[in-house]
Protein backbone atom coordinates (compact mmCIF):
# COMPACT_ATOMS: atom_id res chain seq x y z
CA UNK A 1 0.00 0.00 0.00
CA UNK A 2 1.39 3.37 -1.04
CA UNK A 3 0.43 6.66 0.54
CA UNK A 4 1.09 9.75 -1.56
CA UNK A 5 1.26 13.08 0.19
CA UNK A 6 1.24 16.28 -1.81
CA UNK A 7 3.92 18.22 0.04
CA UNK A 8 4.27 20.55 -2.92
CA UNK A 9 0.65 21.59 -2.36
CA UNK A 10 1.44 22.51 1.24
CA UNK A 11 4.40 24.60 0.12
CA UNK A 12 2.30 26.28 -2.58
CA UNK A 13 -0.40 27.07 -0.01
CA UNK A 14 2.18 28.69 2.26
CA UNK A 15 3.54 30.68 -0.67
CA UNK A 16 0.01 31.81 -1.56
CA UNK A 17 -0.58 33.05 2.00
CA UNK A 18 2.67 35.00 1.86
CA UNK A 19 1.80 36.45 -1.56
CA UNK A 20 -1.60 37.55 -0.29
CA UNK A 21 0.13 39.25 2.62
CA UNK A 22 2.21 41.16 0.11
CA UNK A 23 -0.91 42.23 -1.79
CA UNK A 24 -2.22 43.88 1.36
CA UNK A 25 0.09 46.83 0.74
CA UNK A 26 -1.78 47.73 -2.45
CA UNK A 27 -5.10 47.51 -0.59
CA UNK A 28 -3.70 49.64 2.21
CA UNK A 29 -2.58 52.33 -0.23
CA UNK A 30 -5.98 52.30 -1.98
CA UNK A 31 -7.75 52.83 1.35
CA UNK A 32 -5.38 55.67 2.26
CA UNK A 33 -6.13 57.33 -1.10
CA UNK A 34 -9.87 57.02 -0.42
CA UNK A 35 -9.46 58.46 3.08
CA UNK A 36 -7.48 61.40 1.72
CA UNK A 37 -10.09 61.93 -1.02
CA UNK A 38 -12.74 62.10 1.71
CA UNK A 39 -10.60 64.44 3.77
CA UNK A 40 -13.49 66.84 4.39
CA UNK A 41 -15.11 64.18 6.57
CA UNK A 42 -12.04 64.27 8.79
CA UNK A 43 -11.75 68.04 8.85
CA UNK A 44 -9.28 68.11 5.96
CA UNK A 45 -6.71 65.65 4.68
CA UNK A 46 -4.02 67.27 6.81
CA UNK A 47 -6.09 67.31 9.99
CA UNK A 48 -4.94 65.52 13.12
CA UNK A 49 -7.96 63.19 12.97
CA UNK A 50 -7.26 62.19 9.37
CA UNK A 51 -3.56 61.65 9.97
CA UNK A 52 -4.25 59.67 13.16
CA UNK A 53 -6.70 57.43 11.30
CA UNK A 54 -4.13 56.81 8.55
CA UNK A 55 -1.45 56.05 11.17
CA UNK A 56 -3.69 53.58 13.01
CA UNK A 57 -4.73 51.99 9.72
CA UNK A 58 -1.08 51.53 8.83
CA UNK A 59 -0.38 49.86 12.16
CA UNK A 60 -3.31 47.50 11.70
CA UNK A 61 -2.23 46.53 8.20
CA UNK A 62 1.33 45.99 9.44
CA UNK A 63 0.14 43.55 12.11
CA UNK A 64 -2.01 41.67 9.60
CA UNK A 65 0.85 41.54 7.08
CA UNK A 66 3.35 40.30 9.65
CA UNK A 67 0.99 37.62 10.97
CA UNK A 68 -0.01 36.39 7.51
CA UNK A 69 3.59 36.31 6.33
CA UNK A 70 4.69 34.45 9.46
CA UNK A 71 1.83 31.96 9.07
CA UNK A 72 2.80 31.36 5.45
CA UNK A 73 6.38 30.72 6.52
CA UNK A 74 5.20 28.25 9.17
CA UNK A 75 3.01 26.40 6.66
CA UNK A 76 5.95 26.14 4.26
CA UNK A 77 8.27 24.98 7.04
CA UNK A 78 5.75 22.37 8.19
CA UNK A 79 5.39 21.05 4.65
CA UNK A 80 9.15 20.89 4.27
CA UNK A 81 9.55 19.13 7.62
CA UNK A 82 6.86 16.59 6.72
CA UNK A 83 8.49 15.93 3.34
CA UNK A 84 11.91 15.42 4.94
CA UNK A 85 10.49 13.13 7.62
CA UNK A 86 8.50 11.17 5.05
CA UNK A 87 11.60 10.79 2.90
CA UNK A 88 13.73 9.67 5.86
CA UNK A 89 11.14 7.16 7.06
CA UNK A 90 10.50 5.92 3.54
CA UNK A 91 14.18 5.33 2.85
CA UNK A 92 14.59 3.48 6.16
CA UNK A 93 11.89 1.02 5.10
CA UNK A 94 13.50 0.27 1.75
Swiss-Prot record:
Q: Which GO terms describe its cellular component?
A: extracellular region; peptidoglycan-based cell wall; plasma membrane
Write down the Gene3D superfamilies for this protein, in alphabetical order: ESAT-6-like
Task: State where the protein is found.
Answer: Secreted
Write the record's keywords in alphabetical order, separated by commas.
Secreted, Virulence
- Subunit description: Forms a complex with EsxP.
User: Per the similarity annotation, which family is this?
Assistant: Belongs to the WXG100 family. ESAT-6 subfamily.
* Cited function: Plays an important role in mycobacterial pathogenesis in the context of innate immunity. Aids host cell invasion and intracellular bacillary persistence. Increases host oxidative stress response, leading to genomic instability and decrease in macrophage viability. Also induces autophagy and modulates the immune function of macrophages.
Its name, as the record gives it, is: ESAT-6-like protein EsxO
The protein's organism comes out as Mycobacterium tuberculosis (strain ATCC 25618 / H37Rv)
Lineage per the UniProt record: Bacteria, Bacillati, Actinomycetota, Actinomycetes, Mycobacteriales
What is the gene called? Answer: esxO
Amino acid sequence: MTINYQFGDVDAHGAMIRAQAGLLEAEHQAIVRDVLAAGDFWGGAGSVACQEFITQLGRNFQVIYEQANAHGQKVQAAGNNMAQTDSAVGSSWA
